[in-house]
Every structure is written in C-alpha cells, then in structure tokens.
Amino acid sequence: MREHEREYPRDDAFEALLAQSVDELPPEEIVADVTPWRRAMERVLFGLALCMVTLNFWCLNYLLPAIGTVLLLLGFRALRRENPWLRGCFVCAVLRAACVFPSLILNTTILPGDACRSAAAAVSAALMLALLLCFWQGLRAVRRKAGLPAQGGGAGALLAWYVLMCVLAAVHYTGLLVPIAMLVGYVCILRSLFRLSRALDEAGYAIAPQPVRVTDRALALVLAAALGIGCTLGYLFGGSYRMDWQPADISEQTQTAAIRQQLLDLGFPEAVLNDLTPEDIAACDGAVRVVAVTEDHPFNDGRTVSHKESDGEGGVVSVLDTVYDVRELRLTSVGVQLPGAQETWRVYHHFLWTTDPGFYGTEALQIWPADQSTPDGWRFAGDVTGRVLHDRDGQTFTAPYHALGRQTYTADSVFFGQRTNSDLFAPFSMPRHAEHARGYVAYTAAAVQSDCLLSSWCNYTHQQSLLQYPAVTAMEKRMTSAFGNAGAFYTVQHALQFFPEDAQTLR
C-alpha cells in the first residue's frame, strides 16, 4: 500500500506536465497540415483569383496567372478523389498548365505569331470555363456529402462572371463602368467562396490525405525549373531569324567594272558601291547625276561636358553638352538620276556598323520612299532590292533579308490617333559578333511632276538587349513605338532630301 501511495504524486505530476504541454493551440501551419480540405481550397481560391486578374505592368499579367495555374494544379490534386467533378477540375488544371507554361516559354522567342497567341488564349479560356463548371458541380456534391443543402451559388456565380468577361473581351468593350462593376462582383464572389469553404470546414467535412510519390513542393520546383530552363533556351536560341549566309562571290565586281567607274566619277560613295549586287549596279547604267548624304549615329550614352557661354547680357552661364566619342552606326543615302525622258531616280539606303554593337536578336530597316512623302510628285517604280553583309576572319558573307517589301499595319499615335500605314520594311538578324555588319535597300522613284522635293527616309531599329518579355522583333517594335530608346530597342532616323533641279541636299 505504501508503494502505491508513493506513486500517486508521480502520476499527478505527469498529468500536470501533460496539461501544460497542450495549453496553447498549435501553430496555424500545423492546423493547415491536419486539415487538408482547408489547405486545398485556399490554394484553389487563391489560384482562381490570380488567374482571373490582369495587371498590365511589371509583367504581372504573366507572372500572377502562372502562379495561379500552379496553385490550381496543387489544390485540385488534393481534391481529385472526392468526386468525379473535382477530378474533372484536376484534369482541366493539368491541361491548362500544359497550355500556359509552353506559352510562357514561347513568349521568350519570336516564333509564335498573333494567330498562335490567339489560339492559345482561346484554348486556355475554354479550359477555364470547363474547370469552373466542374468546380461548381463538385462543390454541390461536397455539400451533399457533408449533409448541407446542395448549393454552389458562389461557384455558379463565378462561372457566369467569367462567361460575361469573355463576351466583353470578344466585343472589345472599352467602357469603364462595367469593368468596375465586374471587379466589385468578383470580390464579392470570392468572399462567398471563402465563406463556403469555411462552412464546410466547420461542419466537420474532411478529406483523407492520399500518399503521393511527388510532393507538392517538389512538383512546384520542377515546374519552376522547367520554366526557367525553357525561357533561358528561348532567349538564347529563339530570338533571331534564320539567315541564309553564303560566302560573297568576289568575281561579281568585275562584271560591272565600267559602270562602277562611271558611278565613282559622279561621286557615288565607294564603300556603298562595294556592297551592291551586280544587278543593282547595272540598274544605274548611264547615270546622269549622283546625290549622297552620310550621317553617323551614336548608340551609347556619351559623356557630359561643361563649358561657359555668354548669356547675351554681359554674364556667363555654364552649359552642359553630351559628347559622343564613338558613333557606331553610319547611315548613307544615295540618289542616282537615271537616263530617260521621264525623270527617274534610283535611291539607295545603306547602313554600316563601324564598331561591333553586339547583336541580340533582330534588326530592321524601315523605309519611307519618295512616293509616300510626296505622293503628288513621285510614284514608286520597280521592285525593292537589297541584301545584308558581314565579315568573319577576312571572308565576306552575304544573305537576303528575312523579308523585303511593304508591310501594312495599324499604328496608334498620340498626335494622329489610330491609322493604317503601309511602309517598306527589311528585317534581318546578324551573327552575335559580326564584323563590319552592313546592308542596303534600293528602290526606284519616277517623277509625276517636275520640281518636287525628293524626300526618302530610312529608320534603323537596333536590338540592344536580350531581355524583353514577351519577345518582339525589331520590325514589330518599330510599328508600335516612337524613335529613340524604347526598352530593348533603339531607333535612329536618316533622310535623303533634295530638289532635283539643283541636287543640293537639305541636310
């Protein structure tokens, strides 16, 4: 008896110690771990919120839906065995991930066109509609299983909301009132769904965790790694055109030696003449006059210098100027008057990189020909010709442009509004460290009436960085941007302008 009496205090001490150990509730993350339903539903609802909200800055319109896609995948992965409808949600989430992630990777390349992007967006929207329909019916089945009324009003409202948003996008709705009302409704719907999830949790509804070979963390890391590797490969290998570079035939120059000498005597720049094809040289046979203008353009920030100047009132002021020690791009424009009763000029726009700027993807020449600047004075006559060249280890290589001709597009300008343009474009790519990268575009302008200014413009767009998302070409950027520095691209402008009667350039 005494031994048992001595054990009672020990038992009391153990019970007291046990009570002290459970005085506090476990941390929230522990609670979430033991309530898989709550964790899965939170992932689903946050995933839906991120997938349906578009913030068009800092690439959030791509980043947030990508995170939302992963959350939907993980959330429905845990719920897929609850009923056939939630299993359908998981299938839709997998298919959407298979659509969204390749699209994100392809956005680092210039491969997908507008039609491809539109098709991917349509497939993604259709899968989201199917997912929301399954989610609505899946929640109704869950409520019935939990002994609650079979209602899924919040999910049904979300389905109707998404259908209406698709309709507004299809008709290109531009008003402000309806989107604000839709945003308010969206917030209310999400609150309703969170309350529904909490009500099921409080009613004691639970799901049994299923053993999986790949944890959620591992799956998310694999998706992130695949996305990172895919985007890196896209930037490195998918950002430039495939050019047909061939060694230049030096013997071509001897075929037009007499015409070459005639053009040189008239003042045709020899550096430009050396890059012309025999056909473009022969087109100038019997030339009457040559007009040429050359400008060097910087593609660097230069350096700032200060100097003193008079203010005109006896005082002195300090003036800051930017000085460019290096001007990397040389643009030369040449006009050659051809023989004949009708005044006709052959116009050449030539570029030469005097130093290696580093080529990161695509380049583009945009030409505003004389008939576009002065339609009453000039007409376009003949085809557009040209090529690009570069040197490597003492050997010259040539290639045709990726495309050469008129491109019709719609531009939106602050000053002129939305209008349709049709310009000459010559897009191309150069090897990463091409030497003496150069090229030209040529066309013929015939006079409609005499004494009209011949004004021909050349805009050169250079890609100065790999980092842009989504990736666009220099030509696409030129169609939508102004001159100067525009993110990964920089555009400079050059013109050949003169009155044919005196052949004196205006600049």
Question: Predicted segment positions?
Answer:
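Short extracytoplasmic/periplasmic juxtamembrane "stem" segments immediately C-terminal to an N-terminal membrane anchor
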Residues: 247-268
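Membrane-interface extramembranous regions at the lipid-water interface
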Residues: 2-58, 63-108, 129-168, 183-220
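Internal/C-terminal transmembrane anchor helices
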Residues: 208-242
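Short N-terminal edge-element motif at the start of the domain
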Residues: 268-385
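Membrane-helix interface segments in multi-pass membrane proteins
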Residues: 52-65, 102-125, 165-182, 230-250
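Extracytoplasmic/luminal low-complexity segments enriched in Pro/Gly and acidic/polar residues
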Residues: 421-507
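Short helix-loop boundary/capping segments
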Residues: 371-449
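Flexible coil/linker segments and helix-coil junctions enriched in charged and small residues
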Residues: 306-320, 417, 425-429, 474-478
